[in-house]
Amino acid sequence: MMHHLIQEITKEQLRTDLPDFRPGDTVRVHVKVVEGNRERIQVFEGVVIKRRGAGISENVHGPQSVLWRPALSAHSRVHTPKIAKLEVIRRGKVRRAKLYYLRELRGKAARIKENTNAAQ
């Protein structure tokens, strides 16, 4: 009984405005940052390294920031209200669910083939 109640409560809190994305996809994440009494939006762009969990506790590791610092990678909850917008820039064609090997690669070696068969 209690398990069903928890599922119903968390189902209401899931975000439906997020696009479908997978590890290997290049995404642009718009994050709300609060500094004092001001709120601004900071944009991160990079490759998703992994997704973990399900439902309200689903995490995404990445994106590995291409814009600011090559070695920066972040993880956050997918359904958090701190994510203002999430855009899929490019679909990647990979054979793994966890792309940890991308952490050591730089430049052209870190490229991922584009999946042209993916539904847009």
Swiss-Prot record:
Biological process annotations from GO = translation
Q: Answer yes or no on keyword DNA-binding.
A: no
User: What GO cellular-component annotations does this UniProt entry give?
Assistant: cytosolic large ribosomal subunit
Q: Print the keywords alphabetically.
A: Ribonucleoprotein, Ribosomal protein
Which PROSITE patterns does the protein's record reference? RIBOSOMAL_L19
Under Gene Ontology molecular function, one entry of this record is:
structural constituent of ribosome
Q: What does this protein do?
A: This protein is located at the 30S-50S ribosomal subunit interface and may play a role in the structure and function of the aminoacyl-tRNA binding site.
> Which PANTHER family does the record associate with it?
LARGE RIBOSOMAL SUBUNIT PROTEIN BL19M, RIBOSOMAL PROTEIN L19
Q: Record's HAMAP family?
A: Ribosomal_bL19 (MF_00402)
| Family to which this protein belongs | Belongs to the bacterial ribosomal protein bL19 family.
Tell me the protein's name. Answer: Large ribosomal subunit protein bL19
What is the organism field in this record? Geobacillus kaustophilus (strain HTA426)
Q: What is the lineage of its organism?
A: Bacteria, Bacillati, Bacillota, Bacilli, Bacillales
Q: Which gene encodes it?
A: rplS
